[in-house]
């Protein structure tokens, strides 16, 4: 097949040919599902997208600080920050998309502190009727290799019990205590995972 394409396409379309074969190769890659959040998961995904396009990222949604925390309170949506980082990491046009999606508005603006990518995802979720549909639409726009899936659509909060018995709630508040952590959990503790997250885990190689 490759020799036929090389004969048909002019020389200046060689990059297109390489892209076609790269997509075919990645499409035959293993089905991998990774679970996490923060910068660690997005860093892992940047490398994985060159191995397979059958990659699912199940992302935690307990962030309550910064732009994500504000949107969570004001719009009643799950925090988009970690979801955004994973979308950017898996985007086929990563350098350009990263500059746009990671842009943060400066002080002096009504949007100061907000991240453009967070606002974009929030807008897509509202336009498409749900966060999952909004993420799917955003993935198409960014030409994402794989899927980014929220672990739950419930309003969850991270909580921690310190070694001195202190209980602290909120991901952004826990580090401020400067105390040793005995155990961590979520509130409420019986939230339901998204069906797409469960499906991705069950179908992974």
Task: Please give the residue ranges for each predicted region.
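A glycine- and small-aliphatic-rich helix-loop capping segment at beta-alpha/alpha-beta transitions
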Residues: 47-54, 74-78
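Gly/serine-rich nucleotide phosphate-binding loop at the start of the catalytic core
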Residues: 35, 49-50, 57-62
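Short glycine/serine/threonine-biased micro-segments
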Residues: 34-36, 115
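Short N-terminal binding/cap micro-motifs at the start of the first secondary-structure element
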Residues: 40-44, 65-68
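Conserved catalytic alpha/beta core of Sir2/sirtuin-type deacylases, generalized to analogous enzyme cores
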Residues: 1-31, 39, 43, 52-57, ...
